């Protein structure tokens, strides 16, 4: 019997009339015991009525239903959910303030069928909801799943006691399991009401399963957040604790005082240092930040380094120029022999500086082969002008940051090499040597040559901005001197900012003078022979120059002289100290087998072999060109690792020769029945340029006419299809190379006649230099002809024809052997 009735089903049909207790923010489920505090008069009256009309089992029955809105103080039937829980009033305790504390137990779900009129409290007729008790395999699986999820939920939710897990594990009834679990979940009121109104235990468990899964996900995120926050708090607390300890230790050791002293020292330096206004403000700002930092923090170290760099730079510190032009000239001549042009330019600068007082530093570029004294001349210029000297090697530099520095945001950032060098010099007007400017390259880190555009521009470099300093620095007083072996690798805009001064190779008399004045005393001292009298004769020096070196400069000559002195040093230790005279034979004995042959490029006059002249970054060179013919189908073969321009020159020369075949006495059938091969020896070395045009043309004419070429003639020049000889570059270097090789006659383009003044007078007197305007002029000078004046002037059929053999035919055009 339920609530004292004889038949439960009959009671459900008839309905049950009970008082209703509206609840705020709480829903009571069956099997749930809840304490409630009741203060509203209607609610207290409902409880008193339930206690006054107990059933036969002596239990007070009341319907526990939730309000839709908790804020409603005087709810109407529409403000209350019409689905609640029938419960027993276990205990009722009036309180002194007029409220009532009541303990209720939920028993069964019930629906409100009807509200009875009653002003004192709500009296309702309810219909009990029967729980489904049939068990299935699916329901059993659902029960187990809910048990498992609830276990995971309890482990994450610290608000539910672990004992609750054991209590729930003992419940097998699906309906009771769902009601027991939901009572301990922190769900929204509407979610709990929905579960209360779900009559099917299976659906209730499914819904509960979904809700718990969602709660578990939220709890897992909360756990991660709590763990992260806890770790952060522990770290912060640890750092705080350690910092406090550190400060205490520093206080004991006096380090904090040392940090304060360091800041005071920086402030003192700032007062005494002349800097730009921008730099002064920047240092003050950084100093303010430094005071707020811990002395041991990484950021404090970065700020300290930055301030040190700014203060240590020579913003207005400069050396006074030695403006005495005569004294400066004496210093330059003491250090270097020759080099007239660069010396004149420096003396001109000093003269103008003496008159104008304020003059921007020049930007010079010394271009010449290795060993001619470009770098040492820059050092000598610094000595002559009384300035500090700094050198920056640009060979292999491919990172823009090497010039402009790294931004301070990077770890280990530093200023660029320019600023570092100026700090090292301690002066804002040094002689700054940018060595090997043609050896820079470019990659993904930027183009250093583009960064130098601002540095070497007198109109811009007074506001040079280094990335690290982020301040404008004045470079306009610096005398920049660049060095390069060739101009080809220097970008055009950068060339435009420099005053190029070409330094050609040394002549033999100049090398002799340099050896006597500088190299011999230097090597004698370097090898510990200063107290001995060692005399190296001129023939010995000439032998070293001719047979052991072949260069434009004197670097190899210095090495060979050093080798002679090392042999002498060994001989002195072995045989005792004595004065030594080194003659030609002794020099050759000391240095071993000669490396080079001096004299004519060729031992005798030959067919198809011409001595040409080339200009490389190492200076002037002798370039032999060979041509020969063989039976074939008229192909032109070109070998010797030639560049595209030189190959085109060979093709142009061939076209010119074919166009004048009759005048040269060449049978046209030769071009159909013979292949022509042009080769430039030393095939491993790349060669390019148009200036070998006349050389190739002469070799072709000689090979096709079987006329010998004079071995004492060298030539250079570009040719056109009309036979004109065009001007070339590097005439001085090429002429010096011819002189070194013992050549007697040099053929040059007539348009280069104006450049002869650059060639030393002694060399011009020792050479026969012939300006030529047409290829015919070249051939008349180079070929061994009986009547040179008539060659090529009119068609001829005499001699020179080939009849299927490459042997030299007897011909009136060929000089007798």
Swiss-Prot record:
Question: Which reaction does this enzyme catalyse, per its entry?
Answer: Hydrolysis of proteins in presence of ATP
Q: What up-regulates or down-regulates this gene?
A: By heat shock.
Where is each Lon proteolytic domain found?
Answer: 604-785
Report which residue ranges the record marks as coiled coil.
none
Please give an example of a GO cellular component term from this record: cytoplasm
Q: Which domain of life is it from?
A: Bacteria
Cellular localization per UniProt: Cytoplasm
Keywords, in A-Z order: ATP-binding, Cytoplasm, Hydrolase, Nucleotide-binding, Protease, Serine protease, Stress response
Report any Pfam family annotated for this entry. Answer: Lon_lid
Q: Where is the active site?
A: 691, 734
Chain spans, region Disordered: 789-817
| UniProt EC number | 3.4.21.53
User: Cross-referenced InterPro entries, in alphabetical order?
Assistant: AAA+_ATPase (IPR003593), ATPase_AAA_core (IPR003959), Lon_bac (IPR027543), Lon_bac/euk-typ (IPR004815), Lon_lid (IPR054594), Lon_proteolytic (IPR008269), Lon_Prtase (IPR027065), Lon_prtase_N (IPR003111)
> Where is ATP bound in this sequence?
368-375
Q: Which PANTHER family match?
A: ATP DEPENDENT LON PROTEASE FAMILY MEMBER
Function statement: ATP-dependent serine protease that mediates the selective degradation of mutant and abnormal proteins as well as certain short-lived regulatory proteins. Required for cellular homeostasis and for survival from DNA damage and developmental changes induced by stress. Degrades polypeptides processively to yield small peptide fragments that are 5 to 10 amino acids long. Binds to DNA in a double-stranded, site-specific manner.
Q: Which HAMAP family does this chain map to? A: lon_bact
Descriptive protein name: Lon protease 1
This chain's source organism reads: Myxococcus xanthus
Q: From which lineage does this chain's organism come?
A: Bacteria, Pseudomonadati, Myxococcota, Myxococcia, Myxococcales
């Amino acid at each position: 019997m339920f609530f004292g009735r004889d038949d439960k089903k009959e009671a459900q049909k008839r309905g049950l009339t009970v008082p209703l207790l509206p609840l705020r923010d709480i829903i009571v489920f069956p099997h749930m015991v809840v304490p409630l505090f009741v203060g509203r008069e209607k609610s207290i009256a409902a409880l008193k009525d339930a206690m006054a009309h107990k059933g036969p089992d002596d239990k007070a029955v009341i319907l526990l239903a939730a309000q839709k809105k908790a804020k409603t103080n005087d709810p109407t039937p529409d403000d209350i959910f019409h689905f609640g829980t029938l419960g027993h009033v276990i205990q009722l305790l009036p309180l002194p303030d007029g409220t009532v504390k009541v303990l209720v137990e939920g028993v069964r779900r019930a629906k409100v069928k009807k509200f009875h009129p009653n002003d004192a409290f709500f009296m309702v007729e309810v219909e009990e909801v029967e729980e489904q008790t049939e068990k299935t395999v699916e329901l059993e699986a659902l029960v187990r799943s809910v048990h498992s999820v609830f276990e995971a939920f309890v482990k994450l939710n610290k608000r539910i006691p672990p004992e609750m897990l054991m209590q729930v594990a003992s419940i097998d009834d699906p309906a009771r399991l769902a009601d027991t679990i939901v009572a301990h979940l922190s769900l929204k009121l509407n979610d709990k009401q929905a579960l209360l109104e779900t009559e099917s235990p299976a659906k209730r468990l499914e819904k509960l399963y979904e809700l718990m899964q969602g709660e578990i996900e939220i709890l897992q995120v909360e756990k991660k957040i709590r763990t992260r926050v806890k770790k952060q708090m522990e770290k912060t607390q640890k750092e705080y604790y350690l910092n406090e300890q550190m400060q205490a230790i520093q206080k004991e050791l006096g380090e904090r005082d040392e940090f304060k002293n360091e800041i005071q020292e920086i402030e003192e330096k700032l007062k005494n240092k002349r800097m730009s206004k921008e730099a002064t403000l920047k240092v003050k700002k950084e100093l303010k930040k430094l005071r707020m930092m811990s002395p041991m923090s990484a950021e404090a170290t970065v700020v300290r380094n930055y301030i040190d760099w700014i203060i240590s730079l020579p913003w207005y510190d400069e050396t006074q120029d030695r403006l005495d032009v005569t004294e400066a000239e004496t210093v330059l001549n003491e250090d270097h022999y020759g080099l007239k042009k660069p010396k004149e330019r420096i003396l001109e600068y000093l003269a103008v500086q003496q008159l104008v007082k304020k003059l921007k530093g020049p930007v010079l570029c010394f271009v010449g082969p290795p060993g001619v004294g470009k770098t040492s001349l820059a050092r000598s210029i610094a000595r002559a002008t009384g300035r500090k000297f700094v050198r920056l090697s640009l060979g292999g530099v491919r990172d823009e940051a090497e010039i402009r520095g790294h931004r301070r945001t990077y770890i280990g950032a530093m200023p660029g090499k320019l600023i570092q060098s100026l700090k090292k010099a301690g002066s804002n007007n040094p002689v700054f040597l940018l060595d090997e400017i043609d050896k820079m390259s470019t990659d993904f880190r930027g183009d250093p040559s583009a960064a130098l555009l601002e540095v070497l521009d007198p109109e811009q470099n007074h506001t040079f901005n280094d990335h690290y300093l982020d301040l404008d620095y004045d470079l306009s007083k610096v005398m920049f001197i660049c060095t390069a072996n060739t101009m080809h690798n220097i970008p055009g805009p950068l060339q435009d900012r420099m005053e190029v001064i070409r330094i050609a190779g040394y002549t033999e008399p100049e090398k002799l003078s340099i050896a006597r004045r500088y190299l011999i005393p230097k090597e004698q001292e370097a090898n510990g022979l200063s107290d001995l009298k060692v005399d190296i004769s001129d023939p010995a020096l000439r032998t070293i120059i001719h047979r052991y070196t072949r260069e434009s400069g004197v670097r190899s000559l210095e090495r060979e002289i050093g080798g002679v002195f090392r042999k002498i040093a060994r001989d002195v230790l072995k045989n005792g100290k004595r004065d030594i005279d080194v003659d030609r034979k002794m020099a050759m004995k000391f240095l071993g087998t000669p490396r080079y042959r001096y004299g004519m490029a060729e031992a005798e006059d030959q067919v198809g072999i011409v001595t040409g002249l080339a200009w490389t970054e190492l200076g002037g060179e002798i370039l032999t060109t060979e041509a020969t013919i063989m039976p074939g189908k008229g192909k032109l073969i070109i070998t010797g690792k030639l560049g595209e321009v030189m190959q085109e020159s060979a093709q142009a020369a061939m076209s010119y020769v074919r166009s004048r075949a009759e005048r040269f006495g060449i049978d046209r059938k030769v071009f159909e029945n013979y292949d022509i091969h042009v080769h430039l020896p030393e095939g491993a070395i790349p060669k390019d340029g148009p200036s070998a045009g006349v050389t190739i043309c002469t070799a072709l004419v000689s090979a096709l006419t079987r006329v010998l070429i004079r071995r004492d003639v060298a030539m250079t020049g570009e040719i056109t299809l009309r036979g004109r000889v065009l001007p070339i570059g590097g005439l001085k270097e090429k002429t010096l190379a011819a002189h070194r090789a013992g050549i007697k006659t040099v053929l040059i383009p007539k348009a280069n006649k104006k450049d002869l003044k650059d060639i030393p007078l002694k060399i011009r007197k020792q050479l026969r230099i012939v300006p030529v305007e047409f290829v015919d002029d070249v051939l008349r000078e180079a070929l061994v002809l009986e009547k040179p004046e008539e060659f090529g002037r009119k068609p001829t059929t005499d001699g020179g024809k080939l009849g299927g053999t490459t042997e030299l035919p007897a011909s009136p055009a060929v000089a007798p052997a």
